[in-house]
Amino acid sequence: MFHQVWAALLYLYGLLFNSMNQCPEHSQLMTLGMDDKETPEPHLGLWYFIAGAAPTMEELATFDQVDNIVFNMAAGSAPRQLQLRATIRTKNGVCVPRKWTYHLTEGKGNTELRTEGRPDMKTDLFSISCPGGIMLKETGQGYQRFLLYNRSPHPPEECVEEFQSLTSCLDFKAFLVTPRNQEACPLSSK
C-alpha cells in the first residue's frame, strides 16, 4: 500500500513539475516550411531586427552599437538564391549599408541558408507565434545566436517576451534588444 501511495505522489509531482516547466524541447522548434520552389515568397520584403539571444554576450557583441537595422530580402539572380540588403543605424546616428547573398540548401522543406563567402556560417529559419515575426538561428565559427525579426519596427512587447522565454529555455541566457529610438536609415538600391 505504501508503494502505491508513494508512486501516486511521485506521479502527481511529475505532472505538476511538467505543467510549470514551459520550455519546449529543442526539437519542438518549428522550422519554417518551404516547399521546393526556387524562392521562399512569404519571406521576401522588409524585416526589422528586434532582438538577439546567445549563450554569452560576446556572441551578441556585434550588435552592441546598433540602434536599429532594416533588411530587404529579395530573390537572387540564380535559382535558390536570396539577396539581403540592410542598413544599420548605429547608436551615434551613422548609417552603414550591408549586403549578403544566401543560398538555400537543396531539399524539400529545408530551411537552411548558407552565406556566400562564409562557408562556416549556417542560418536556420524558425516560425514563432508573434504576428509578422520570424526567428533565425545563426551558427558560425565560435558563435551561435538566435535573432528575432519582425515586419514592424515596433512589434508587440509580447513578441520580445516570447522570444526571450523560448531562447532562455534553450540556455541562450544573454539577451539584447535593439533600442530602435532613431529613424531607420534608407535602404540602398545597390
From Swiss-Prot:
Binding-site list for tetradecanoate: 138, 145
Annotated S-S bridges: 23-169, 95-185, 130-159
Top-level taxon of the source organism: Eukaryota
Chief localisation class: secreted
Signal sequence region: 1-17
One GO cellular component term: spherical high-density lipoprotein particle
One Pfam assignment: ApoM
Keyword terms, alphabetized: Disulfide bond, HDL, Lipid transport, Secreted, Signal, Transport
Compartment(s): Secreted
UniProt cross-references to Gene3D superfamilies, sorted A to Z: 2.40.128.20
GO biological process terms held by the UniProt record: cholesterol efflux; high-density lipoprotein particle assembly; high-density lipoprotein particle clearance; high-density lipoprotein particle remodeling; lipoprotein metabolic process; negative regulation of plasma lipoprotein oxidation; response to glucose; reverse cholesterol transport
Summary of the tissues where the protein is detected: Expressed by the liver; secreted in plasma.
Family matches, as InterPro entries: ApoM, Calycin
Gene Ontology MF: a single term: lipid transporter activity
Family named by the database record: Belongs to the calycin superfamily. Lipocalin family. Highly divergent.
Function noted in UniProt: Probably involved in lipid transport. Can bind sphingosine-1-phosphate, myristic acid, palmitic acid and stearic acid, retinol, all-trans-retinoic acid and 9-cis-retinoic acid.
SUBUNIT field: Interacts with LRP2; LRP2 mediates APOM renal uptake and subsequent lysosomal degradation.
Name this polypeptide is given: Apolipoprotein M
Organism: Rattus norvegicus
Chain's gene name: Apom
